[in-house]
Amino acid sequence: VAYVTVLIGLAGYGSHRLAIIFLYLKHARKKPVPLELFSELPLVTIQLPVFNEMHVVDRLLDSVSKIDYPIDKIQIQLLDDSTDGTVEICRDGIARLVAQGFDAEHIHRTERTGYKAGALENGTQFAKGEYLFILDADFVPNADVLQKTIHYFSDDKIGMIQTRWGHLNRTY
């Protein structure tokens, strides 16, 4: 009886794996495309939540400043809950972005209510954009990330987009 039960379980598991492989191969070549392109690009608020991440903040701000999107259609919020030297690095980085013409602000909270979710909620109260683009502190987005993704929102059925991401290295 135990042997038959295990055999049935393994057969079910194997069948499921084969079905997943089949579906992957069936749809692997299909690349999704937006239904239409926006005639005028919408305003996007880029939210960057950070907490004591002094080693990666400058890299993050530099990569965000290189995103290929009209500068007048971007609002950058650096949502900083840091308790170390990251606060000064954030302040200086935002000042550099403002000097480049970006609508950028450093929102520093001393009470971490809700942690990252709380920082995002707090920033959303001041967001001007029609869409939110959230990047973790260790992300380095490609310059074309908004151009490749924003047009999917022309479909009313799309409410969120998750893109593929990877890691640069193990330390920072």
Go through each PLM region and give its residues.
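N-terminal membrane-anchoring/stem segments of glycan-assembly enzymes
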Residues: 1-40
